[in-house]
Amino acid sequence: MKTLYLTAILSVMLLSTVASAQNGAFPKLPHVPGTGKLSDDPKSTQFTFIAAGDNRPSGNAIKQPKILSHILKDSKRFKPTFILWSGDTIAGFRSAGKNMHHKTLIAQYKEFFRQAAKAGVPMFNSPGNHEMDVVNKSKDETVETPDEKMVALYLKEMKYPKDTPPYGAFNYGNSRFIAVDTEEVPPITAVRSEGKTVAKKLKLDPGFVSMQQMELLAADLEANKDKTHIFVFMHHPIKPAKNGSRLNKENADALEALFAKYHNVTYVIAAHEHLYFNATGDSIQPHSKKSPSSDGPTYLVSGGAGAPLDSCPGDAEKNCSSSYHYLVFEVNGDKVDVKVVMVPAKVKKA
């Protein structure tokens, strides 16, 4: 069943891509807005950027963890051109009641943007479950689910143009950067993985990526085969440290197969797990990578920007760290070096 589903998805995306090519144009992913303006430098082959995620406070707090402020200030020493963020920028769904435009949610976004300004460079976010979901309680269970009103609020606060979905892409230098929305509201008929259960019997949503987004993503990858590097950033991981945190399995399998087709997809960066995990390697620090590569992309989980930390599984001691951190990417032509920068223990979360 899994193989048939995966084959069907890839076939539909391939047919859509071929049809677009025959018409002389590929459908484009929309431009993803940042916290500031980024001017592309098409000739640039040497630049640095930062990646991180999961800074959201505990409970329904407005105040951001000190870890976030430290990361945004400390990373300046690497002189990044911009920052990629893999979601959960606010406490979000724990604060969402019947009125999704509650002043607490607005205040949470305002505080995040105030902190983001400390970076001095634009930040680009792929949404997480805390921005997009609500909690529904019944006698039997408490379930987290995506919500249209939360999505609308996210689009408004993140200043997306009207009628634009919360995903997209942008170019810088020799590279393409793609933000995937793993938190789409699924149709009622969608069959999805079982979400993991956390504290107080809250069942988390496993995420969802629509066929429409998958088709646009496939077409965008095809249209950008000439780019030296493609970096993908998203919230739910395709290859997490713990299987219970994985993106909805059918979506994860389809995306992994799609990314493997394009040898210039260099890195896939996710969060959701509050830790660091090098899913592709056997060490904390990722190895240097050249593009194109038939080995497929390097998969990294970077969710240590301030949210309460998760523990690493016992079998991942060599390539997992339950630590606050951020990633530094240095692009030099066809080569990329990544450095994991740990936040000193003296920097307190609160």
What are these regions (language model features)?
Residues 22-102:
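N-terminal active-site segment of His-dependent metallophosphoesterases
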Residues 7-16:
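Bacterial N-terminal signal peptides
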Residues 54, 87-88, 128-129, 235, ...:
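Active-site glycine-centered loops adjacent to acidic/histidine catalytic or metal-binding residues
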Residues 17-21:
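Sec/Tat signal peptide C-region and signal peptidase I cleavage site
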Residues 85-86, 90-93, 224-242:
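Short acidic, glycine-rich surface-loop motifs adjacent to enzyme active sites
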